[in-house]
Amino acid sequence: YPELFAAGAIMAGTPFRSASSLQEGFIAMFKGISKPAEEWAKLVHDQQPGYTGRYPALIIFHGDEDRTVKQSNMHEIVKQFTEIHATDQEADHTGIIKRHRYSAFHDAYGRTVVETWQIKGMGHKYAVDPGNESDQGGKTGTFASSAGLYSAYYSLISWKLIEQMR
C-alpha cells in the first residue's frame, strides 16, 4: 500500500516477494537470494500495476552477526528500493555512528529514500539502547539487544517525526 505509507522500517528482513512459500522463505532467510535490481523492483511494481505515486522510504537495520537472516538480504533490499526510487545503489552518505555502519541513498531531489544500519556485534534481534538520554530507550530481552543504538529513535528521525536530540 504505497499510497498509505510514507516510510517504513525493516529489522533484519528480506526483499519484498523474495519468497512465495515457507520453504522459499527459509532459503531467502538462510542463504539469501540475489537478483538484479530491475527484477526486484518488478516484484513491487507488479503488486500494484499502474501505480504512479511515490513509494515509501525505508530504513533497514541488520545485525552483522545475524545467523537467522543472511546479511546479504540488506543489500538486496537496497537494490530493490533504490530501483523503485529511480536512484543508484551507491550510498550518498556513509559513516560510523555509535560504532555502527550507516549508509543513506538519495533520490534525484536529494531526499533520503533508503537508509541502512549494520549493527556491530548484534545477531537476529532488535537494537535497543536502555537509558534515560533523549536518544535511548527499549529493554533488552529475548529479541532485543543492547546495541548502543535505539533503532526506534533513529527510525523516527528518518521519518521526520522527531528531530535528532543530540
What function would you assign to each model-found segment?
Residues 1-4, 40, 73-77, 148-155:
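Stable alpha-helical elements in mature extracytoplasmic
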Residues 2, 82, 86, 160:
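Hydrophobic/aromatic-lined pockets within catalytic cores
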Residues 3-19:
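A conserved short beta-strand
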Residues 6, 56-58, 153:
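Residue-level detector of short, conserved catalytic/binding motifs and their immediate flanks
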Residues 8, 64-68, 141-145:
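Second-shell loop/turn segments in exported
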Residues 16-127:
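The feature captures the conserved acid-bearing segment of alpha/beta-hydrolase catalytic domains
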Residues 133-166:
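Catalytic active-site module of serine/aspartate enzymes centered on a nucleophile-bearing elbow/loop
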